[in-house]
Regions:
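Ubiquitin-like/PB1-type beta-grasp interaction modules and other compact soluble beta-rich domains
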Residues: 1-87
Length: 88
């Protein structure tokens, strides 16, 4: 984090499921990682930071509730990202 300091940063948890797990940083848990981010961080910023391609469809939950890429995250949020469910 650049020039932020403790007052401008916060910790969130990111959980990636199925094929998206490949985008977790090295050394992460099996499905999740903790991230220190700026207080103005949006979901899209996290997806970009993890290098998840924009064109991959995603289902986004924040604390278990449907979220949007433009949504600003808060201290302690749990961001869960799933690929769409398909099958028949």
């Amino acid at each position: 984090m650049e020039g932020g300091g403790k007052f401008n940063s916060m910790e969130i948890e990111v959980k990636l499921f199925a094929t998206l797990r490949d985008y977790l940083p090295k050394g992460s848990g099996r499905f999740s990682c903790k991230m220190e981010v700026d207080r103005s961080t949006r979901v899209q910023d996290i997806l970009s930071r993890l290098k998840i391609p924009e064109e991959i469809p995603k289902i986004i939950l924040i604390n278990g509730v449907h979220g949007k890429k433009e949504q600003i995250l808060k201290e302690g949020d749990v961001l869960s990202v799933f690929p769409p469910v398909a099958g028949g």
